[in-house]
């Protein structure tokens, strides 16, 4: 239905190959998930949730399927009820956040480069590592657009606290 050109098994194999190729160096993955696409069963949904756990995505953008006139899926049979789409989206978001916490906990103590983006106050900046880990770091004497080397700390539910090294 969704015009995927690959299977979950093929995707998982590519992830395994990439992780093997990078060895001890970390690699991260992000994805988008649509909940409640026409024809999605409870079993399909459970398989999708299990797949998220298997891969260990750093970030998952979850959203409910939205029926749009003029699209092929508009007339597909087995439209999923709006309440069910919303419930599945909430559940998948919770699962994705648990996975994110696990992935980011595994980064604690590691070092990486961060592109400083948004100044918050004084010397405090938000930014992202090369692996798309969101951080907040105090970087006195630096400005947005610069790259600094940091040690990653704990995840606060929004960003990883980091310190310059």
Predicted feature residues:
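Conserved non-cysteine loop/helix-boundary elements of the Radical SAM core domain that shape
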Residues: 2-59, 65, 70-84
């Amino acid at each position: 239905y969704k015009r995927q050109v690959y299977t979950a098994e093929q995707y998982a194999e590519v992830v395994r190959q990439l992780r093997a190729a990078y060895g001890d160096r970390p690699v991260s993955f992000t994805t988008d998930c649509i909940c409640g696409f026409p024809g999605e069963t409870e079993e399909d949904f459970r398989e999708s949730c299990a797949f998220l756990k298997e891969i260990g995505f750093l970030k998952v953008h979850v959203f409910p399927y939205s029926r749009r006139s003029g699209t092929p899926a508009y007339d597909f049979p087995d439209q999923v009820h709006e309440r069910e789409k919303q419930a599945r989206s909430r559940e998948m978001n919770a699962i994705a956040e648990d996975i994110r916490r696990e992935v980011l906990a595994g980064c604690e103590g590691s070092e990486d480069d961060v592109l400083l983006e948004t100044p918050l106050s004084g010397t405090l900046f938000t930014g992202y590592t090369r692996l798309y880990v969101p951080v907040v770091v105090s970087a006195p004497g630096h400005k947005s657009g610069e790259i600094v080397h940091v040690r990653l700390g704990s995840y606060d539910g929004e960003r990883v606290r980091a310190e310059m090294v």
